[in-house]
């Protein structure tokens, strides 16, 4: 049996698990009800995360049982961390966990992965490397939690991201465990998408926190294990996870900065994400998802090209130009007027919004000038 064949088992496992769960009483009680600060307009079961995680476990179990991959400590750490967040997310979907409890679960999952041996090797100082790994894992976990704000968005971006991690693990930096996990998450998401991204109807199932946190943590772990543990140029090792996951990073940064500037709590829900702003600009929900997925795929292809090229100067220049473009894109979206925007008087920080575009242009010029001297 091959890695791909073992991982492919995640697809029917996810499909069947979600189908079966929809027939249970949980489909009526574990639901996301419509709210003023949420995008959906009808109560929807929060069962998708169970299917995605079930697919991951089935694929990994088959791969280990058939000796496609060994039962390694790293594999156990990543799956164990995902398991912690799946359970915490499931409790949150049913009872609503306080933010500190969710953060504690995320910290425990990150500690388990780091204990298993997945570390940042591009930094020699162990304390700094551990701190960076924790920040990265928690950041990606919460980024996907925030990104799960429109039908099909989080699962589509996770599918694309995992596909590029798998390509890297099959070709550039061969690693069967990373390839298996990336494909397992990818196929698990593909089993979920028929329920969540339907052509002419709204989603019949959401992934919930039990799905979004698992996806974010899994992708963060894959980023650490597949790239940041590889010796070599710092730029080359950073390029894949940073570009493949640039859209979630952009969305989280945009939401955080704008809410702080407007004097609103960062943890408060809202209809002010990247996807929502694209809809306010005239796109349909599905076209917004397709556009962001296309951007993610283009960035993934770019990252692979840089890794194959293996030229630090060209890669650095390309990455700086890419992030300069993303800064401009984020600045443009931040200026989009929201129908339900707050009527409160602007805070001192909010007054800076008037000059945001000029500030971004200065930053972009600085990045490009700096890159020209590398």
What are these model-predicted stretches?
Residues 43-54, 154-155, 210-213, 284-294, ...:
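Select subsegments of transmembrane alpha-helices in polytopic membrane proteins
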Residues 136-139, 271, 275, 356:
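Alpha-helical membrane-protein architecture signal
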Residues 57-63, 292-307, 366-374:
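Alpha-helical transmembrane segments and their membrane-interface junctions
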Residues 67-83, 252-253, 303-329:
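Hydrophobic alpha-helical transmembrane segments and immediately flanking/interface helices
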Residues 1-252:
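"…together with the soluble PPM/PP2C metallo-phosphatase catalytic core" -> "…together
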Residues 19-45, 201-202, 254-283, 338-352:
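Cytosolic, membrane-interface loops and tails of multi-pass inner-membrane proteins
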Residues 5-6, 318-374:
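Signature of alpha-helical transmembrane segments in polytopic membrane proteins
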Residues 243, 265-308:
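Mobile late-domain/C-terminal helix-loop "cap" segments
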């Amino acid at each position: 049996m091959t890695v791909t064949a073992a991982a492919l088992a995640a697809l029917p496992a996810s499909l069947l698990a979600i189908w079966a769960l929809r027939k249970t009483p949980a489909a009526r009680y574990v639901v996301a009800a419509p709210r003023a600060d949420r995008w959906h307009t009808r109560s929807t079961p929060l069962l998708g995360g169970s299917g995605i995680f079930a697919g991951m476990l089935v694929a990994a179990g088959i791969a280990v049982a058939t000796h496609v991959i060994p039962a390694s400590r790293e594999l156990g750490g990543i799956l164990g961390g995902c398991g912690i967040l799946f359970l915490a997310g499931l409790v949150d979907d049913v009872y609503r966990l306080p933010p500190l409890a969710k953060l504690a679960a995320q910290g425990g999952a990150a500690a388990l992965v780091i204990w298993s041996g997945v570390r940042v090797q591009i930094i020699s100082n162990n304390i700094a490397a551990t701190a960076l790994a924790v920040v990265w894992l928690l950041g990606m976990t919460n980024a996907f939690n925030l990104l799960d704000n429109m039908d099909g968005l989080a699962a589509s971006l996770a599918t694309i991201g995992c596909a590029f991690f798998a390509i890297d693990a099959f070709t550039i930096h061969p690693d069967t465990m990373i390839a298996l996990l990336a494909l397992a998450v990818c196929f698990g998401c593909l089993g979920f998408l028929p329920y969540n991204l339907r052509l002419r109807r709204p989603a019949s199932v959401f992934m919930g926190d039990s799905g979004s946190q698992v996806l974010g943590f899994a992708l963060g772990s894959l980023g650490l294990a597949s790239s940041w543990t590889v010796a070599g140029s710092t730029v080359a090792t950073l390029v894949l996870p940073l570009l493949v996951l640039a859209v979630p990073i952009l969305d989280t940064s945009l939401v955080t900065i704008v809410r702080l500037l407007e004097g609103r709590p960062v943890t408060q829900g809202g209809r002010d994400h990247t996807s929502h702003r694209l809809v306010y600009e005239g796109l349909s929900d599905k076209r917004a998802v397709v556009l962001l997925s296309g951007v993610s795929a283009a960035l993934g292809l770019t990252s692979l090209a840089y890794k194959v090229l293996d030229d630090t100067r060209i890669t650095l220049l390309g990455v700086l130009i890419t992030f300069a473009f993303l800064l401009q894109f984020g600045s443009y979206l931040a200026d989009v007027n929201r129908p339900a925007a707050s009527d409160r008087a602007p805070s001192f920080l909010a007054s800076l919004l008037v000059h945001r575009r000029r500030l971004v242009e200065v930053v972009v010029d600085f990045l490009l000038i700096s890159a020209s001297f590398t």
